Design a protein with these regions (language model features):
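Src homology 3 (SH3)-mediated interaction modules
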Residues: 1-58
């Protein structure tokens, strides 16, 4: 896992249950960084996909 900091807040689409929301400044653990959508885990254990351009690897 690689940590990434959120540059912006993101609200997951209600139409896509695989997306997760996060707030600016949150630190997510990146599980898979291939492609434009990364698989990430929040500190509460929630796992899902996030837009990579909203994050910066730490």
């Amino acid at each position: 896992l690689q940590p990434a900091g959120a540059l912006f807040s993101y609200k997951a689409s209600e139409d896509d249950p695989t997306e997760i929301s996060f707030a600016k400044g949150d630190v997510l653990q990146i599980v898979d960084s291939s492609g434009k959508w990364w698989q990430a885990q929040r500190s509460n254990g929630e796992l899902g996909i996030v837009p990579s351009n909203y994050l910066r690897l730490i």
